[in-house]
Regions:
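Exposed, low-structure sequence patches enriched in small/polar residues
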Residues: 2-362
């Protein structure tokens, strides 16, 4: 419902939905059933005002969800409830002056989980700044800070099976996460020359209060949630370069991605005497990806498209263990013939994946 006034615009929004999600896992040992019921409602009111390039909006609402799960076999908690109610307020501001545009969003939410008897104050402030030098050049900067809780499956306190050999145990803990994200972006475009280039640098850091401990045996992998403050961070540098040649009916592009991820992992191991102990290790993963693409359309009745993906990644665990870098290469070729209103397409794909130990799969 929207009401326009001279001083601004009022908007009233209400949504209610119900979802039933049955799932089952059938194995030789027996059958596990997950019957999940979700009743969700969100009701809000918002006020919007624009004046002389300045926009302000204030939104307030109440949000609730009744989420229940019945799990079989009954040796685990079979009637789980993660119902919660929240009150939220979201002020938003935008200012545009000439070549500059800036925004500020300040969401704030107070949330209560009834069965867990826990209350939280969540937030997600973010800001965005854009500078458009001229028609060709534009730059932007973005930053955000978000505190959130785990989803429905994260809150389940017991042990449950996800596939034929993987188990997860919430261990009765309540996971929370605080993430900060920063992004720097730039672009250049020249439509006359059909030349475009973009580049982005993104950094993200997450701080968590829990960490999954991994235990591996011959017939099972068990992930048990432990109360252990930890963090992870990642860097991503990406760029896309595209060039079209109109006279040749040709379009080309190249996308490059370079990323690095760091974090901590917890593994449960047995010593020489058979005693179980937990080992906390740092890890690092580096990845490089290149995607060239060519589209050639010399006539209305024919088009050829070539698309390749080249990925190269390597890992480091602790201070001594370095895993062999692996190369993945995928090539795709599509030939399209148009006869009247009928399109005939021939496609071919080639895969080459490194498996380690100087072996690969084609």
């Amino acid at each position: 419902l929207i009401r326009n006034r001279e001083s601004g615009t009022w908007e009233f929004h209400s949504v209610t939905q119900y979802a039933y999600q049955p799932a089952s896992l059938l194995l030789e040992e027996g059958k596990s059933k997950f019957n999940q019921h979700n009743f969700y409602t969100d009701n809000s009111a918002a006020y919007l005002r624009k004046h002389n390039g300045f926009t302000q909006q204030y939104k307030a609402g109440i949000q609730g969800e009744r989420a229940t799960l019945k799990y079989t076999p009954t040796k685990q908690p079979n009637d789980f409830n993660a119902s919660h109610l929240s009150l939220y307020l979201t002020p938003y501001f935008q200012l545009e002056r000439g070549k500059w545009l800036t925004t500020l969003s300040l969401p704030l939410k107070a949330e209560r989980y009834f069965s867990q008897q826990r209350s939280f104050l969540f937030f997600n402030p973010s800001t965005y700044l854009r500078y458009k030098l001229d028609y060709h050049w534009a730059f932007s900067l973005y930053g955000s800070l978000k505190r959130s809780a785990g989803d429905f499956s994260d809150l389940y306190p017991g042990l449950y099976q996800t596939d034929y050999r993987t188990w997860r145990d919430g261990n009765g803990l309540f996971p929370t996460n605080t993430t900060q994200t920063y992004n720097l972006y730039g672009e250049y475009k020249n439509t006359v020359q059909e030349f475009f280039i973009t580049a982005a640098l993104t950094y993200s850091r997450s701080n968590r209060n829990t960490l999954f401990e991994q235990s591996v045996s011959e017939d099972a992998i068990v992930y048990t949630r432990r109360e252990l403050p930890n963090h992870s961070d990642s860097w991503n540098l990406s760029s896309t370069l595209s060039k079209g040649i109109y006279d040749w009916h040709l379009k080309t592009s190249l996308t490059l991605l370079l990323s690095r991820s760091n974090g901590e992992q917890l593994t449960r191991l047995a010593d020489s005497k058979g005693n179980q102990q937990s080992l906390l290790q740092t890890y690092r993963y580096d990845y490089l990806k290149a995607e060239p693409k060519i589209i050639w359309s010399p006539a209305d009745v024919f088009e050829a498209e070539y698309h390749a993906t080249l990925g190269y990644g390597g890992s480091k665990i602790g201070s001594d263990t370095r895993l062999t870098p692996l190369l993945d290469f995928v090539q795709r070729l599509h030939l399209t013939f148009s006869i009247g209103q009928v399109d005939l397409r021939l496609s071919g794909e080639h895969y080459r994946n490194d498996l380690g130990g100087n072996t690969h799969l084609n």
